[in-house]
Amino acid sequence: MAAGSTGERPFFEIITSIRYWVIHAVTLPSIFLAGFLFVNTGLAYDAFGTPRPDAYFQATDTKAPVVSQRYEGKAQLDVRLK
């Protein structure tokens, strides 16, 4: 070991190893697929409480809602959406 070395493998050695790619060939695509399904199934909207794209405006609306009171904005929008 060289002086000052922590004993860890160099990054280049890790990413050029077969073991790294065997593990990551499965995990990286599965993380991407999980995120894709999380968003496309609408679970992300439910988990974070955001309105779905079709719920921003009512069918009768012709323009975006305007909030007139800074601290009562959510209450104004909730009344409007009922």
From Swiss-Prot:
Gene Ontology process terms (BP): photosynthetic electron transport chain
Q: Which family does it belong to?
A: Belongs to the PsbE/PsbF family.
**Gene3D superfamilies named among the record's database cross-references:** Photosystem II cytochrome b559, alpha subunit
What is the protein's given name?
Answer: Cytochrome b559 subunit alpha
Required co-factors: heme b
What is the role of this chain? This b-type cytochrome is tightly associated with the reaction center of photosystem II (PSII). PSII is a light-driven water:plastoquinone oxidoreductase that uses light energy to abstract electrons from H(2)O, generating O(2) and a proton gradient subsequently used for ATP formation. It consists of a core antenna complex that captures photons, and an electron transfer chain that converts photonic excitation into a charge separation.
**Pfam families the UniProt entry points to:** Cytochrom_B559 (PF00283), Cytochrom_B559a (PF00284)
Where in or outside the cell it occurs: the entry states:
Cellular thylakoid membrane
Organism equals Synechococcus sp. (strain CC9902)
How does it sit in the bilayer? Single-pass membrane protein
How is this protein organized at the quaternary level?
A: Heterodimer of an alpha subunit and a beta subunit. PSII is composed of 1 copy each of membrane proteins PsbA, PsbB, PsbC, PsbD, PsbE, PsbF, PsbH, PsbI, PsbJ, PsbK, PsbL, PsbM, PsbT, PsbX, PsbY, PsbZ, Psb30/Ycf12, peripheral proteins PsbO, CyanoQ (PsbQ), PsbU, PsbV and a large number of cofactors. It forms dimeric complexes.
User: What keywords were assigned to this record?
Assistant: Electron transport, Heme, Iron, Membrane, Metal-binding, Photosynthesis, Photosystem II, Thylakoid, Transmembrane, Transmembrane helix, Transport
Question: Bound how, and how many: what does the cofactor note say?
Answer: With its partner (PsbF) binds heme. PSII binds additional chlorophylls, carotenoids and specific lipids.
* Annotated binding of heme, by residue: 24
Q: Which domain of life is it from?
A: Bacteria
GO terms for CC?
photosystem II; plasma membrane-derived thylakoid membrane
Q: Give the InterPro entries listed for this entry.
A: PSII_cyt_b559_asu (IPR006217), PSII_cyt_b559_asu_sf (IPR037025), PSII_cyt_b559_N (IPR013081), PSII_cytb559_asu_lum (IPR013082)
GO MF terms listed in the record are: electron transfer activity; heme binding; iron ion binding
